Amino acid sequence: LAQYAKNDKGEVIPESLVAKINNALKFNQGFMTTELCAASMLDMKWHELKSLDGVDIDAFESKVAEEIGLIPEITFRYRSTYFNHIFGGSGYNAGYYGYLWAEVLDKDAFSIFEQSPNGVWDLELAAKFKQTFLEKGGSEEPMVLYKSFAGREPDSAAMLRGRGLID
């Protein structure tokens, strides 16, 4: 931000304002993360059923909420009757968790850049990311590609740090 966030006098945005912006982005993340996890679990639980014959939707949702320990203050992000992602044939069937998993990969890969001696603008590391991960596309298993870039499996703690849930 210091490179371009300037007022009409050319003064750089104050660090205190940047800190407030960053803190605001992390507000309520515990709620939002729980809500996403609950929706992902509900999606998977629906797809574990062998048949939908005779299933009471409300009772099923209540049972899942109890099984996963969902507190009453946090409800499912979408009710099953209009949770189009999981039933609409959009390719997300039993895969709503993909949003969280993508965030894990995003935050973990970025953390590798942050830890680089050259910082996030490390051109050599960027080239490695491009060559070992991005350019390969679907030619190999995604985890194999990620590990070839990172040298390890993704660390989900990076997502939790990014959301301000852990230090």
Task: Please place each PLM-identified region on the residue numbering.
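Cation-handling catalytic/transport regions enriched in His/Asp/Glu
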Residues: L1-D167
